[in-house]
Amino acid sequence: MKNKLQILIFDSGIGGLYFYSEIRKYIPHANYIYVLDNEGFPYGNKYKNFIFDRVTNIIIYMHNLYKFDLTIVACNTASSIALSYLKKFFISPVIGIKPDINESVNITKNNIIGLLATKITINYVLSNFFNFKSLNKIKLITLDANELIKLSEEKMRGKIIHLNKIKNILKPILLNKNIPDTIILGCTHLLFFYYEFKKIFPIGTKFIDSKKILLNKSIMLISENYIKKNKIKHQTVYYTKNNRYFKKICPLLNKYGFKYLKKIYIYK
């Protein structure tokens, strides 16, 4: 049995805070290290090699500082590119988040699915799932969610985002003759717009994300491997650049219980 459980949560932005808050409800006694690659944010408009190098280098760097029992890559884009490599590299479990294609295919009634994600995640889905003959009957409508990701960060920092602004970004999907009855939220940031999406899309639209899968995996992997102690009040954030963006999100990080803020010196 372990006296202290160490969990690493990685994201380019603050979208991973959603998973942190959810996982902490079930595993409140762990020491959480949230790693924020704010210098590389957003990943959606970056090249694959750039993302792969940053994700792997940063996570390896963190594993040299701490002995993690679980590493969570709470970013669809990063998971699509680097998760397979990281799983082979570390002995301790590494889990990530990817669009739940199977569930969306199983529940769609009109065989039209919408995917909101970064271009890299969209390409991952197209190359790994929609080249199978069994999915030929499915029509996939995709939308680059980069602007929605930026807006979600503004919302998390307390800014009011008007519904029409979100609706305008979603027009390429909403203006289709047949609107998808199932929408995949292929980015952690989009979970913060769940209620706005419910208002914008037709009644009955199903929204699919991978939070339950990620939570279940986390609980299954570590729930029996440590001694429960008192809940740790203050957690730690590591960031990659002390820029204006980071200063803006500091109050939010503090609100989530991250008192200790430390810079990663892997990049100059």
Swiss-Prot record:
One of its GO terms (biological process) is cell wall organization. Provides the (R)-glutamate required for cell wall biosynthesis. Its EC number is 5.1.1.3. It comes from Wigglesworthia glossinidia brevipalpis. It catalyses: L-glutamate = D-glutamate. Pathway: Cell wall biogenesis; peptidoglycan biosynthesis. PROSITE patterns: ASP_GLU_RACEMASE_1 (PS00923). This is Glutamate racemase. Substrate binds at D11, S12, Y43, G44, N76, T77, T188, H189. Keywords: Cell shape, Cell wall biogenesis/degradation, Isomerase, Peptidoglycan synthesis. Belongs to the aspartate/glutamate racemases family. Gene3D superfamilies: 3.40.50.1860. One of its GO terms (molecular function) is glutamate racemase activity. It comes from the Bacteria. InterPro entries: Asp/Glu_race (IPR001920), Asp/Glu_racemase_AS_1 (IPR018187), Glu_race (IPR004391). The active site is at C75 (proton donor/acceptor), C187 (proton donor/acceptor).
